[in-house]
Amino acid sequence: MSLTLVLNGQTRTFATLSQPSSLDCLIAELALKGDRIAVEHNGEIVPRAEWPQTTLTEGDRLEVVHFVGGGTLF
């Protein structure tokens, strides 16, 4: 059992995920902290509260963006 997804433009197979899996499971598999990322699933931004109910299926397209602090102080 595995799940193949297009993640940030690259096709990746996740051997530990099966179909269907939740977006929450993928975020855990990637070891990402949910408070500093945004996720787009098949062209739609997914609010964090909906990650556990968002079902991933074979071939889904995801974009995961990390927020980074920075800048200068004047």
What positions do the PLM features span?
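Ubiquitin-like/PB1-type beta-grasp interaction modules and other compact soluble beta-rich domains
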Residues: 1-74
